[in-house]
Amino acid sequence: MSGKVEIMNMDMKVGKTLKIKGKXDDDADGFXINLGQGTDKLALHFXPRFGESTIVCNXRDGNXWGKEQRDSHMXFXPGSEVKLIVTFEEDGFKVKLPDGHQLTFPNRLGYSHLRYLSVQGGF
């Protein structure tokens, strides 16, 4: 995975929506979007893996990752346009994919305010 963008002092509270738009690199094998309190406190790790045709979601608390949630509804490919809408709710996240499919992932760490966003990989 190649590039990385980080925002350290974001102000995203429960009820807010984040729109992410970009283009996957032509030779990308995937990308990752992370939301949380910091690099090791991730409420949502959203990682489409092109080679596996799977979207993996997870949470990270310190050095410990949670149990992966996998969804085989792949709406991304190398070179494709990426448009995501992430809604932060008290009990979890709703991620709307470009084709309208929606994934949900629980707010396992119980955060009510997110300060960290990173986008990395072939994006």
From Swiss-Prot:
The membrane spanning regions, by residue number, are none
Give the record's subunit note: Homodimer.
Q: Where does a beta-D-galactoside bind?
A: 65-71
Which ranges carry the Galectin domain? Answer: 4-123
The UniProt keywords, alphabetically, are: Lectin
Q: Which organism is it from?
A: Sus scrofa
Q: What is this protein called?
A: Galectin-2
The free-text function statement in the UniProt record for this protein reads: This protein binds beta-galactoside. Its physiological function is not yet known.
> What domain of life does the UniProt record list for this protein's source?
Eukaryota
Under the GO molecular function aspect, what terms does this record hold? carbohydrate binding; galactoside binding
